[in-house]
């Protein structure tokens, strides 16, 4: 059931062998409409693909006290990018499958959103206007911390889910 007060949003990249995968994540409090935690997982920090993938499960387990709904950006193969994926191992969809299964095993609610659902609706200008992020020079920050595009995307997913899909009733 998708009625948790908290949402863990993930913008996953499974690319371990095919580049430097980076997963951005955000823990969001729906009641206070506030970002509690943000971070990234970098494939290059792990000795093998399985350790990188396992770090995602460790992240989910570290949020156990919040019992969050988990929102994940889906992977879609768009026609204009399909040729670039020829002979690809499609590591990100593999990682998505692992995350979905592990979230289900833990009894957490999982919700999948596309990038297209959130990128326009919650663009940087809107997030700045709503005081979710700040612009400092060429960088975007959250509470004074410079954030990557992957973290920004996870924030977009958390806010979109909170606004349109969560069944949590704010007091």
Regions found by a protein language model. Give the residues of each.
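Phosphate- and other anionic-substrate recognition elements at nucleic-acid/protein interfaces
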Residues: 1-171
């Amino acid at each position: 059931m998708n009625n948790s007060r908290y949402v863990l949003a993930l913008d996953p990249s499974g690319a371990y062998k095919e580049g430097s995968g980076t997963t951005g994540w955000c823990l969001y409090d729906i009641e206070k409409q506030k970002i509690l935690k943000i971070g990234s997982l970098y494939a290059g920090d792990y000795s093998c693909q399985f350790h990188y993938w396992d770090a995602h499960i460790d992240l989910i387990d570290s949020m156990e006290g919040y019992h969050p709904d988990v929102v994940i950006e889906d992977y879609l193969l768009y026609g204009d990018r399909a040729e670039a994926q020829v002979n690809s191992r499609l590591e990100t969809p593999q990682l998505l499958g692992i995350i979905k299964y592990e979230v289900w095993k833990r009894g957490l609610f999982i919700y999948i959103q596309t990038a297209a659902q959130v990128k326009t609706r919650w663009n940087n200008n809107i997030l700045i206007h709503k005081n979710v992020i700040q612009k400092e020079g060429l960088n975007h920050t959250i509470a004074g911390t410079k954030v990557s595009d992957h973290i920004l995307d996870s924030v977009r997913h958390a806010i979109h889910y909170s606004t349109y899909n969560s069944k949590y009733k704010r007091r």
